[in-house]
């Protein structure tokens, strides 16, 4: 159970918000969150790194010198991995890095990661109506009133897409905006502070509670 004070646009206390999520037990929490994080980062890899072996490098068909009698080491190709311009031994080839993890485990890891950041969570009332037009300055001032440092990495969680908030937030270097339905372990762990609207908390409870 996570209990948070809800702040309004002016930064004043405006009530309480509760979030009741089933999390992993203490012995397994770090392990399951780590697995989910590795899965997410592995699945983000393109896997297109490629190098050429000695048989794929252009040239090298002619034997550089005869086998015996020169006093030099034997050489059958100028594209040997030992030579400059030669092929690569055990280099990367295109492959899939995708990692499987059961859906129930993924959701448990996500809930556990979110609950672990409760101390860094700031819950605010829905403030879309307070921004009559896109204005980054107004959003930064509001974050200051909420006790959020704009110079630290901040994750802003909304229930639904709001164009005015998006346009106001996109020019803030260390502020990342995501929807409650798109929560992921990496963003939750990478942020120094997390700001969530009341409706986003309700959406998280609805979508991720088991």
Curated annotation (Swiss-Prot):
Region forming the signal peptide: none
Basic residues composition-biased segments: 60-71
Biased composition (Polar residues): 41-52
Keyword Cell cycle part of the UniProt annotation: no
Region spans: Disordered: 41-80
Superkingdom to which the source organism belongs: Bacteria
Keywords in alphabetical order: Ribonucleoprotein, Ribosomal protein, RNA-binding, rRNA-binding
GO molecular-function terms, A-Z: rRNA binding; structural constituent of ribosome
One example of a Gene Ontology biological process annotation: translation
GO terms under cellular component: ribonucleoprotein complex; ribosome
Reported function: One of the primary rRNA binding proteins, this protein initially binds near the 5'-end of the 23S rRNA. It is important during the early stages of 50S assembly. It makes multiple contacts with different domains of the 23S rRNA in the assembled 50S subunit and ribosome.
Family: Belongs to the universal ribosomal protein uL4 family.
Subunit structure: Part of the 50S ribosomal subunit.
PANTHER family: 50S RIBOSOMAL PROTEIN L4, LARGE RIBOSOMAL SUBUNIT PROTEIN UL4C
Name of this protein: Large ribosomal subunit protein uL4
Organism field: Acaryochloris marina (strain MBIC 11017)
